[in-house]
Amino acid sequence: MGLLNEFAIQLYSVKDETAEDFIGTLEKLGKNGFGYTGVEFAGFGGVSAEEMKKALADNGLKAVGSHAMTDKLLENLDEEIAYHKAIEAEYIICPWADMETKADVLALAQKLTPIAEKITAAGLKFGYHNHAHEFVKDEGEYLLDILFDKLPAGTVMELDIFWSEYADVDSLAYMEKNKNRLEILHVKQIGENKKNVELNKGFIDFEEVIKKAQAMGVKHFILEQEEYEESSMASAENAIKYIRGL
């Protein structure tokens, strides 16, 4: 597949399709369809773990992990862990949290620390996915850096490069600085007026980014697409064709 032997998709990218037919969408994305090798979930659509595991296997898809909001983890952590273990997923990622100040971050870290510890004790990995607001500075430090400093060692960074670029961060330098915790990269393109565009239409040189990320030891590369030229599935197909060509 060019630079990448494996390429996953965050299913939020095709949420309109999974809402209609979750298993059918996996069939379109997997080995007999577009050729993705993995998925990252954003909810499981009411599908049982047993049925999901079979659908993943049937379509040559690995469950990288999922996005789960803090409230969901606080309320249903045991169930989330059990589901992830049943489908052989590796990561549970917090995809968003409000924060404006260091005090907000410290309060968040207090909430997330016992969650992270329980996930790790179960043999899974806990991580955090950024947007742009975590790159606000308080006392000279990015809020994201303060958060990771306060979370347990081993907490994984899932860097969304669209949002780091949106925040005018030097993404490659930031990745290098955090390479010991950076295991997942959201492959997501930024274009004119800071819009999310197709992978081949924006400013990020993904050939350079992927090569450098591989050298840093990044384990998983995951498409996330929130805006589409034509449709969510057309974007998903275009993205993997682009990645194959690198």
Q: Can you name each region flagged by the protein language model?
A:
Residues 1-32, 45, 50-51, 57, ...:
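Histidine-acidic metal/acid-base catalytic patches
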Residues 8, 38-40, 65-67, 93, ...:
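Conserved beta-strand positions in the central sheet of alpha/beta enzyme cores
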Residues 8-20, 66-73, 98-104:
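Active-site mouth loops of central-metabolism enzymes
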Residues 11, 41-43, 68, 96, ...:
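Short glycine-centered, acidic/aromatic-flanked micro-motifs in structured strand/loop junctions
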Residues 27, 35-38, 55, 70-156, ...:
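Active-site acidic/histidine proton-transfer and metal-coordination neighborhood
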